[in-house]
Amino acid sequence: MSNSRNIVIVGGGITGVSCLYFLAHHPSFNRDRDTITLFESAGIASAASGKASGFLSLEWHGPSTSSLAALSYNLHKELSDQYDGVNKWGYRALDTWSIKADENCQQPDKLPEGIEWIAPSIVENVTRLGNKKNSGQVHPYKFCHAIYEEASKVANVTLVKGHVLSVDENEVEYRLIGDDYAPDEEEEITSAEELHTIHSMEATHIIVAAGPWTPQLIPNLRISGARIHSITIDLPIKLNGNAVFSEITYKDGTIAAPEFYAREDELYVCGEFDDEPLPELSSDTKVDQDKCALIKQCANHFHQIIRDSPVKVRQACYLPISNATGAPVIGKIGSSIYVAAAHGCWGITLGPGTGKVLSELILDGAVTSANIDLLDPEGSLE
């Protein structure tokens, strides 16, 4: 009887690729015998993990996630040091601020140095929220792709572009999605038939890390998705490491609260959540151009340099949220199914740590690097 492990991961966001990486690098993982199959319907980091701000925080976490956050924050630094994350995925420390602005401001507060994209004349109040010891950032899309590539170098990894339809103990059923087939006519006919066929794959362990789509596979999990829009702006200056949680009062008294994350080569700005229903696939996520325009219009009020700069990217994604606990759901369900989802706005911060603890749970049988007792799936099951 073979003792090989055939591990399936559903979801190619930061949680899925972090699981892949730490499984592949675990000392108990047999690179000659064990396999990992990653199912992703649209591509690595195609949903929220590729469209998030990439903000990292060490301290803004409650009792249920503080231990995991400390582990994960340190892993971000270790991975950056090991693989040149500064250049490969924009890893850097940040200063974090709360800035209250008012276009009718009479007595401006002092604007922190290095934030050239906010007009000093509108700054009513500044509060430091974090510093370079406890705040940071990555470009999440670049991070996910780099970590996936590093895992693929050391493990037998198969990436399947497919829509997983169901998971059961030791088996997944899926339908292929794709255009990755030979172009001749005979192959096209075969491909069309193949794409409508439901396939099955045996697995010794199944990790469901499908974000807000996780309940499609584990229906009694109380997890939903909230859509949020963001844009990036191409400013003609090099941007220092600052995150700004703002509130601005316009001349007419209207109040808005955009969040700004300064990357080296662009300014990331996000707006508010809306109630657009979750589509069946992440690739079906709709971008409301009017909402992106509103984000830019809001940002324009902060400085002329923003008004004069073009938008590079307009995008939307769904953040996975636990309707039961408000915290991530991480752990084992049944004998061979594991779940890692509902990280909300902290998915990028908590991604590597989640991958680490799940690799321990699967290959060691217990988690030792962080305390995740309060994240057990039992608390989120109906």
Curated annotation (Swiss-Prot):
Bilayer disposition of the protein: Single-pass membrane protein
A Pfam cross-reference name: DAO
Disulfide feature: none
Stated family: Belongs to the TDA3 family.
Species this chain originates from: Schizosaccharomyces pombe (strain 972 / ATCC 24843) (Fission yeast)
Cellular compartments per GO CC: cytoplasm; cytosol; late endosome; membrane
Ranges that cross the membrane: 7-27
Subcellular location: Cytoplasm; Membrane
Its EC number(s): 1.-.-.-
Keywords: Cytoplasm, Membrane, Oxidoreductase, Transmembrane, Transmembrane helix, Transport
InterPro entries per record: FAD-dep_OxRdtase, FAD/NAD-bd_sf
Name of the protein: Putative oxidoreductase C1F5.03c
Job description of the protein: Putative oxidoreductase that negatively regulates the retrieval of cargo from late endosomes to the Golgi.
